[in-house]
């Protein structure tokens, strides 16, 4: 018997090890990786918290269950208990083991589920904003109330578990007793048997359940700030004057009922317990009826008046939660009185107008600059650089390896040889070549660089497409980049990676389910395994509690490529704030900067006023750095993120209104403007552009993220919403309200005007013949002083599978007039060189002219030649014919 007991413990440990084998391997690898990236303390924060919490929680569970068990065995006169639980020590030992295992399990479940909420509770940071109903700081609702809710659910669940377990234990032991004594089971005696077996225990548990129902309704009171019963989010008139009153009564009555229940147990009377339970149920039902009556017979007919204070609460706190309360609002009275001098004063803004568009540029990059089939550009980023002494907006992209495209896609190729991408491509957004293609300032492999921007180590071991592990410093040289006659190779000189000791190779072989870690003869002692190379997944693994922007962007600094990811703190617990996309509070509180060679990942706090990020910083010590610790050259490229701006724009469409009466009527709703990308295509929400511009009251150009608003379900533009991001202006938001009594063209309405212009529509129709297609670029509406200049690039895509869209013309509009030109500069000249510095109304004059048939025939001839050249891959001939076609089109006036 002793030998069996001696074998039990090691056997139990072996079973546990097998059951959790993969988790143990993963845990060891995580320790090694977090140690490599210098965030081991962050990783152990969770584990340390769980262990610290488990000890007292285990003791509480163990003692509580043991005492409950002892209370069931205390009366020796109950035969059922004697037979089942008290006849010998074996039952006690068995229960001890059962209690130990269950208590550990429950303690782990509780600790692992709620460690984070407990740490948030203990490290709470005030918002210095109070809710208007209970006057509690917002931090209570975000950092403390979630823990109260969790405790309530756990305790109620445990109490119900005790009740159910007691009944199950009774029936099992009763059945065992009847079988052993050969007696029939009498269902009529169940009630008496239960009372004899655990009557007092069940009564105590019932009293505790009633007590916690009281606590649960106290939580419901606080949760009224999230009510959706009224016309706006948050506590409404009915919630405050009916629901709240009943909740308070229920809290008091259930508290009294729990005391009465416990006193009744002492006196041995069980009838008061039933009465207390009945009163509690009656009050809960009455509350629902009372709220229904108040809403339908008092509020409904007087809703606008009665709900105004609560609508105001919703407006104020929603604006605070989405950082819309600090927007600078200005009237923008459109005068359209620009003179030549105004154009000269805003030359830098006009020179940086984007005529290259995102989608066509990415297509062009992926056809012309991938160099080899296994390279790819994941997306295009937009930024600003001082190039050769001039402030320029640029497109740029990193050339990454697409390992899925490798042929042959062997283990060595995928993990040992093709380990990194190489280089970047950059072009100014405001210029194209004579063929209408992006004019590169950085291109090719090795990089051809026409700028003063140094790019001496352009390797990309960490990027947006680096989704697999690599092993570096092996016996095989890494592929670096292709040359005409051979491939250039490279040896990794960064410090990323985990050493490939035999133990580590074994761990990774198990973890990745890949025996090549052990069989490969190319792996040396000083080789290193680099994992978690995808930049977003890397950031998420270190700080999973942050929300990350969908568009990381690259920066060239110190000869290398760095990645910047915007990180957000979000919650859905902000009182009275209307939820959008499942959140009702957001801040861009951190920027993540990742080195593409070494993988160094740094989290910089960019919003010190955000209590949530400060709460994280207190919990995860050593994770965050101050913004000033980031290199100045990196900080200069911080952008206001589009994901944040998009959700703020969505909220602003409704919450620019501050008057509760106007808000209730819904009479001043906005929506983000629509746009149209194809001449006969569907409309989509306009993508907010980053623009280099001089704000009307400023004397210096800066990069601004700009959105256009329409009146809801109308195409008339009503406002411009901008976010600034250069230097000390970072994060400042400005709203220009346009005249409501004038027709101001939105991007979509501007497209309709283009389509309705007789001369332009004829040229578009000519271009659209025989399979070629005209595409609109990205519409830019540029504010200059008190005027708006509209710019629309036109792309021509020839027929053919591998055709490249080329920017061929630019349409400019000012003061309701349209000019079709080969460039912005030519269009500006055409507009402002007419008499009295006003737009020459060419469209009205041109409408009376007829088009020479011979010119149309010639145009068709050049077009056919261009298409033939394109099919043959002769891009020089293609460009020449397209230029001739453009000259003819310009001459048709």
Curated annotation (Swiss-Prot):
It comes from the Bacteria. The keyword Hydrolase does not apply. It comes from Clostridium botulinum (strain Langeland / NCTC 10281 / Type F). Pfam families: UPF0182. This is UPF0182 protein CLI_0022. InterPro entries: UPF0182 (IPR005372). Keywords: Cell membrane, Membrane, Transmembrane, Transmembrane helix. It is found in: Cell membrane. The keyword Metal-binding does not apply. The chain crosses the membrane at residues 9-29, 49-69, 94-114, 154-174, 202-222, 246-266, 273-293. It is a multi-pass membrane protein. Belongs to the UPF0182 family. GO terms for cellular component: extracellular region; plasma membrane.
């Amino acid at each position: 018997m002793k030998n069996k007991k001696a074998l039990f413990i090691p056997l139990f440990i072996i079973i546990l090890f097998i059951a959790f084998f993969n988790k143990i391997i993963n845990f060891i690898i995580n320790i090694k990786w977090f140690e490599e990236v210098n965030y081991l303390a962050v990783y152990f924060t969770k584990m340390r918290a769980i262990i610290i919490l488990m000890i007292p929680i285990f003791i509480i569970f163990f003692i509580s269950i043991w005492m409950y068990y002892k209370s069931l065995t205390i009366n020796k006169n109950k035969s059922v208990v004697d037979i089942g639980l008290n006849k010998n020590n074996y039952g006690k030992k068995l229960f001890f083991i059962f209690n130990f295992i269950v208590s550990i399990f429950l303690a782990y479940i509780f600790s692992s589920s709620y460690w984070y909420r407990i740490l948030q509770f203990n490290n709470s940071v005030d918002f210095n904003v109070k809710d208007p109903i209970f006057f509690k700081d917002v931090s209570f609702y975000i950092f403390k109330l979630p823990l109260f809710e969790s405790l309530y659910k756990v305790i109620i669940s445990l109490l119900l578990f005790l009740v159910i377990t007691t009944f199950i234990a009774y029936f099992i032991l009763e059945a065992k007793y009847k079988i052993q004594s050969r007696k029939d089971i009498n269902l009529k005696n169940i009630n008496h048997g239960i009372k004899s077996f655990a009557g007092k225990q069940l009564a105590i548990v019932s009293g505790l359940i009633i007590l916690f129902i009281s606590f649960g309704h106290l939580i419901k009171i606080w949760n009224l700030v999230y009510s959706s019963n009224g016309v706006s989010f948050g506590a409404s008139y009915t919630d405050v004057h009916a629901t709240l009153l009943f909740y308070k009564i229920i809290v008091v009555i259930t508290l009294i009922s729990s005391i009465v229940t416990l006193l009744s147990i002492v006196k041995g009377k069980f009838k008061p317990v039933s009465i207390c339970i009945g009163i509690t149920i009656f009050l809960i039902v009455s509350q629902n009826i009372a709220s229904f009556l108040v809403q339908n017979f008092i509020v409904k007919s007087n809703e606008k008046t009665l709900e105004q204070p609560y609508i105001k609460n919703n407006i104020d706190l929603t604006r605070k939660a989405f950082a819309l309360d600090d927007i600078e609002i200005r009237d923008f009275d459109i005068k359209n009185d620009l003179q030549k001098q105004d154009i000269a004063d805003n030359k830098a803004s006009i020179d940086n107008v984007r005529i290259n568009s995102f989608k066509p540029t990415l297509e062009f990059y992926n056809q012309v600059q991938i160099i080899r089939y296994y390279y790819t550009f994941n997306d295009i980023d937009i930024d600003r650089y001082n190039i050769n002494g001039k402030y320029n907006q640029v497109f740029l992209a990193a050339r990454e390896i697409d390992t899925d495209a490798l042929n042959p896609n062997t283990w060595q190729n995928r993990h040992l040889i093709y380990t990194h991408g190489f280089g970047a491509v950059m072009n100014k957004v405001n210029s194209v070549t004579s063929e209408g293609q992006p004019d590169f300032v950085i291109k090719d492999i090795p990089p051809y660089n026409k700028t003063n921007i140094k790019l001496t180590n352009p390797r990309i071991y960490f990027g947006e497409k680096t989704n697999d592990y690599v092993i570096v410093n092996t016996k095989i040289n890494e592929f670096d980049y292709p040359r005409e006659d051979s491939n250039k190779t490279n040896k990794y000189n960064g410090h990323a990676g985990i050493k490939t000791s035999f133990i580590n190779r074994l761990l990774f072989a198990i973890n990745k389910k890949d025996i090549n870690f052990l069989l490969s003869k190319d792996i040396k002692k000083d080789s290193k395994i680099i994992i978690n190379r995808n930049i977003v997944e890397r950031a998420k693994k270190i700080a999973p509690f942050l929300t990350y922007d969908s568009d990381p962007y690259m920066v060239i600094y110190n000869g290398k490529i760095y990645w910047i990811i915007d990180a957000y703190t979000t919650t859905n617990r902000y009182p009275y704030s209307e939820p959008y996309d499942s959140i009702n509070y957001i801040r861009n509180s951190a920027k993540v900067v990742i080195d593409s060679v070494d993988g160094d990942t740094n989290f910089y706090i960019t919003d010190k006023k955000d209590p949530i990020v400060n709460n994280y910083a207190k919990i995860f010590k050593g994770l965050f750095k101050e913004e000033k610790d980031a290199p100045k050259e990196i900080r200069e490229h911080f952008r206001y993120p589009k994901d944040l701006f998009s959700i703020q724009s969505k909220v602003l469409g409704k919450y620019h209104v501050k008057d509760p009466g106007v808000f209730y009527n819904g009479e001043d709703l906005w929506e983000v403007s629509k746009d149209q990308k194809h001449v006969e295509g569907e409309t989509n929400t306009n993508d907010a552009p980053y623009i280099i511009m001089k704000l009307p009251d400023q004397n210096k150009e800066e990069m601004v993220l700009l959105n256009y608003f329409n009146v809801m379900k109308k195409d008339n533009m009503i406002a411009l919403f901008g976010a600034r991001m250069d230097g000390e202006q970072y994060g400042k938001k400005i709203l220009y309200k346009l005249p409501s009594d004038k027709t101001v063209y939105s991007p979509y309405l501007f497209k309709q005007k283009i389509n309705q212009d007789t001369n332009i529509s004829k040229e578009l129709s000519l271009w659209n013949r025989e399979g070629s297609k005209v595409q609109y670029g990205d519409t830019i509406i540029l504010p200059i002083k008190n005027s708006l200049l509209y710019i629309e690039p036109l792309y021509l895509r020839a027929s053919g599978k591998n055709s490249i869209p080329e920017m061929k013309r630019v349409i400019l509009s000012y003061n309701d007039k349209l000019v079709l030109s080969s460039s912005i500069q030519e269009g500006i000249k055409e507009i402002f060189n007419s008499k009295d510095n006003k737009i020459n109304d060419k469209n009205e004059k041109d409408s009376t002219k007829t088009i020479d048939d011979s010119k149309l025939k010639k145009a068709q001839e050049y077009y056919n030649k261009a298409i033939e050249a394109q099919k043959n891959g002769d891009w020089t001939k293609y460009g020449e014919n397209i230029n001739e076609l453009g000259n003819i089109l310009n001459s048709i006036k």
